[in-house]
Amino acid sequence: MGALRWLFWVGLSYLSCCRLPRAEAQFPRVCMTVEAIRSKRCCPALGPDPGNVCGVLQGRGWCQGVQVDTQPWSGPYTLRNVDDRERWPLKFFNQSCWCTGNFAGYNCGDCKFGWTGPDCSVRKPPVVRKNIHSLTVEEREQFLDVLDRAKTTIHPDYVIATQHWMSLLGPSGEEPQIANCSIYNYFVWLHYYSVRDTLLGPGRPFTAIDFSHQGPAFVTWHRYHLLLLERDLQRLMGNESFALPYWDFATGRNTCDVCTDQLFGAPRPDDPGLISLNSRFSRWQIVCNSLDDYNRLVTLCNGSDEGLLQRRPRDSGEQLPTAEDVRRCLSRHEFDSPPFFRNSSFSFRNALEGFNKPEGALNSPMLNLHNLAHSFLNGTRVLPHAAANDPIFVVLHSFTDAIFDEWMKRFHPPDNAWPEELAPIGHNRLYNMVPFFPPVTNDQLFQTAEQLGYTYAIDLPGSLEESQAWAAMVGSTIGGALIALAVLVLLLVLFQHRKQRKGFEPLMNVRFSSKKYMEEA
């Protein structure tokens, strides 16, 4: 079953089928108590005073009922009140902190992305995400080192649930079924939880559900996912100016230029499916990979190690996307189109995700852009529930987000460009993205990167229309120049011809007499 998940992604198996919180989220550790779980109330105090709930004494926020999207959804998930991610997060909590102004976080103790200061009123200079190949040696090592540290550092604020909501308090009803998790493994767990199957019983998964792919939320969900990791890494380093780099995978090549020991690890000579022992990533264990086992046991990924990271870039002639693919994708004016799913045509989102051809036409058996890059790298990354285990996931999605940001800046879409209803479950504009907590909607991330505190040092190709207009202008210029040259040549020919005719005329107009020299006149 797990091996078929990627085929489900690419459409080959159609039968299956703004208040920004603090760091990553399943649920804050402070809220995973028996009392909080039973009351469904996650409104922690800010600081030592228990009365300072949500920072209310400083005017930072207050505790209130969670707002959820009530609009109908479409798509293959037709069940109701079966999955604990429906109307997220009401199965777990129905009250949380609502933060005022630029305050944010599960207890309103932080600032929104892009803001700083004691009252969160100062705009931070945006951090700049750079091409990973343009980083200095120091910047590169800093990034790789902090990733490695995040793999082994327990997340300071959040824990993961190891059981579904009905079993969250354990057999006795007194023991929360939770586990600590490292910062990076938490990043992996969030992605897994957003794509995991709905369970109808032991070994009876309903696979036609995905909260982070195959719909409009693909771009906003992964954007927020990266922002959370970026902030966690900044805090781990003590460097608020740190920014995630990106990997420009639109090279058109059949080689992986980040699969080197200087970056994410070359193939291991004696087993090309594993990472070279010269790379720090050769030691990385994956988590959340055993989807079939979780389904059979009716449980969730608990963050346990499940084997070494694998990667085997394809050598069968398959090529990565090209810059022309990016250009064509950026030429799509419409953000998304009905049915807002993997079979949407002439949709920027679907072209970027990779179910459409870059020019917008639907071509289900084919992979493009984001999907093609995943498929090309092969190994652990091919399965969506486990894909984030490979650190290349971070830089691949950073580039995908850069394309999304470029599109936002070029077209300035209105809010209603995003469907309010009848997108697949989790993908309506005001749906709370699963499994982030406190709740954050798709709409809150549907803005330019600069508004969220970061930018990209990137020069993406112009749109197809711009290219065609440029080609037309160049063509008309060249055409005009050729016409002018032809006229000039014609004038020169006429001038030369005239000169030649004048050359055969007598220099003096002389009349000759028929009389001989000696005769009298």
Curated annotation (Swiss-Prot):
Function recorded in the entry: Plays a role in melanin biosynthesis. Catalyzes the conversion of L-dopachrome into 5,6-dihydroxyindole-2-carboxylic acid (DHICA).
Listed cofactors: Zn(2+)
One Pfam short name: Tyrosinase
EC code: 5.3.3.12
Transmembrane portions of the chain: 475-495
Localization terms from the record: Melanosome membrane; Melanosome
Gene Ontology MF: a single term: dopachrome isomerase activity
The organism's place on the tree of life at top rank: Eukaryota
UniProt lineage: Eukaryota, Metazoa, Chordata, Craniata, Vertebrata
Organism: Gallus gallus (Chicken)
Signal peptide (from-to): 1-25
GO annotations of cellular component type: melanosome; melanosome membrane
Binding site for Zn(2+) B: H370, H374, H397
Metabolic or biological pathway: Pigment biosynthesis; melanin biosynthesis
Topology within the bilayer: Single-pass type I membrane protein
EC category: isomerase
Glycosylation sites: N94, N180, N239, N302, N343, N378
Keywords: Glycoprotein, Isomerase, Melanin biosynthesis, Membrane, Metal-binding, Signal, Transmembrane, Transmembrane helix, Zinc
InterPro entries hit by this protein: Di-copper_centre_dom_sf (IPR008922), Tyrosinase/Hemocyanin (IPR050316), Tyrosinase_Cu-bd (IPR002227)
GO biological process terms, semicolon-separated: developmental pigmentation; melanin biosynthetic process from tyrosine; positive regulation of neuroblast proliferation; ventricular zone neuroblast division
Annotated PANTHER family: L-DOPACHROME TAUTOMERASE, TYROSINASE FAMILY MEMBER
Ranges of the Cytoplasmic topological domain: 496-521
Reaction equations catalysed: L-dopachrome = 5,6-dihydroxyindole-2-carboxylate
UniProt-annotated binding residues for Zn(2+) A: H191, H213, H222
Co-factor remark: Binds 2 Zn(2+) ions per subunit.
Record's protein name: L-dopachrome tautomerase
